Amino acid sequence: MLKAVHFGAGNIGRGFIGYLLYKSGYEITFVDISKELVESINNYKRYNVIILKDNVEKEEVKNIKAIHIEDEENLSKAIVDADIITTSVGANNLKSIGEKLRNYLKIRKANIDKPLNIMACENALFATNILKNSILEKGDKDFIEYVNQKIGFPNTAVDRIVPNVDIKKELPIDVAVEDFYEWDIEKKAIIGDLNIKGAELVDDLEPYIERKLFLLNGAHATTAYLGYLKGYKYIHEAIQDDFIRNIVSKMQEEASIALSKKHNIKIDNLREYSNKVIKRFKNSYLKDEVVRVGREPTRKLSGNDRLMMPAKLCYEIGITPKFILYGIAAGFLFDYKEDPQACKIQDDIKNFGLEKTISKITGLEENSDLLHEIVKKYKELKETFRKR
C-alpha cells in the first residue's frame, strides 16, 4: 500500500487532504503538535467525514495513524517510507516544517532511492515553494542535488470549506465538510507518478491559485467582515443580506475582469465560478461563523493576499476596485475581541492613526490613491454602522 505523511491533523487535514489520500489508496500517517489529537487518531484508527448537504452523507476513512511532531524516531521512519508528503499547517508554519523535514530527508537519502513528492496544501500563493526553500536553505551541495533529482515539489490550489460546525458525531475526531472540493496540482513539478483521486493536474497553476484566492477567499473575507459589521453570526445569513451580497458579487466581477485580462480566461467562466461560490456560501448546513472566516485580519489584509492582490491588479489595468475596497475597509473595522490580530489592528489605529495602520498592513504608501480610497470606504462604513 502507498504511504502518505500529512503534517497537520486538523479539520482540513482530515476532512479534505486525508480524505482524498485515503480514497486514492494511501495509508496515512498524520503528524501533529497536539498530543490529544495524536492519541485519539491512534486510539480510534478511523474517522468519518460528514458531508453537509440536503441528504447528509458519511464516509469512513481508515488505514490511519498519527505521530507527534516531536517523536523523532517514528517520524524519521515515516518520512523514509513515504511515497508522498503533504501539509495543511498554515503558511506561517511552513518554514519550521521545512527545517524539520530537511533532517529527515537526509536520513531518507542515506536509506532509500525512490522518488517522492512533497506538497503544501495551504491558503497561500505557491506555498510549496516556501516549504522547498526552507528545506534547501541550509543543505550542502550533495543534499541539494539529491532533492532536485529525487523530490518533486508541485504547488497546489486547494479548496474545501471545513467549518467548526456543531453536529452529532460518532467519534470525537469525525469532521464535517461541504460537498464541494477542488485540488489542483502543478503537473510539471511532479516526479514519477502521482495519482490522487479527485485532484486535477494542470499545466499552469497560477490562474487556478489566483481565481480561488480572489473569487473564493476574497469574497469569503468580504462576506465575513461585512457580516460582522451588520451583526450576523453565520456566513449563510450574511450572504442572504442584499447589501452584502451586492458588494460581494460586484467585487467578484471586478476581480474577474482583472483575472480575465491577466490570464486570458473567458469572463463567462469566471462568472460561473463566482456564482458557484455564492451558492456555496448560502449552504446553511455549514453554520460557518463570520468570526472564523474573518480571523487573522493582518494576514488577510496584507499586500499579497486575497483582497489587496486583486485590488492592486485592478488598479494596474485601469479598473477602480470600488467594491473590493469595501471588503478591505470592513476588515479594518473587524474588532472581534477574541482575535489577537484584530485587537492589534484596532490598537494601532488608535495609537498611530488609520492611514499609518493601513499602510503598515497593506504595504501601500500613505499618499497612494488606493490607500485614500480605503480610508474613504472605512469612514463610510463606520458612519453607516456606527462603529466607534
From Swiss-Prot:
Substrates-to-products reaction catalysed: D-mannitol 1-phosphate + NAD(+) = beta-D-fructose 6-phosphate + NADH + H(+)
Listed GO biological process terms: mannitol catabolic process
Protein name per UniProt: Mannitol-1-phosphate 5-dehydrogenase
Single GO molecular function: mannitol-1-phosphate 5-dehydrogenase activity
EC number of this enzyme: 1.1.1.17
CC annotations in GO: cytosol
Domain of life per record: Bacteria
Gene3D superfamilies reported for this sequence: N-(1-d-carboxylethyl)-l-norvaline Dehydrogenase, domain 2, NAD(P)-binding Rossmann-like Domain
Covalent S-S links between cysteines: none
Keyword set, alphabetical order: NAD, Oxidoreductase
InterPro entries: 6-PGluconate_DH-like_C_sf, 6PGD_dom2, Mannitol_1_phos_5_DH, Mannitol_DH, Mannitol_DH_C, Mannitol_DH_CS, Mannitol_DH_N, NAD(P)-bd_dom_sf
Chain residues that bind NAD(+): A4, V5, H6, F7, G8, A9, G10, N11, I12, G13, R14, G15
Family recorded in the similarity comment: Belongs to the mannitol dehydrogenase family.
Recorded name of the encoding gene: mtlD
Keyword Oxidoreductase: yes
Species the sequence originates in: Thermoanaerobacter pseudethanolicus (strain ATCC 33223 / 39E) (Clostridium thermohydrosulfuricum)
UniProt xrefs under Pfam families: Mannitol_dh, Mannitol_dh_C
SUPFAM superfamilies referenced in this protein's UniProt entry, alphabetically: 6-phosphogluconate dehydrogenase C-terminal domain-like (SSF48179), NAD(P)-binding Rossmann-fold domains (SSF51735)
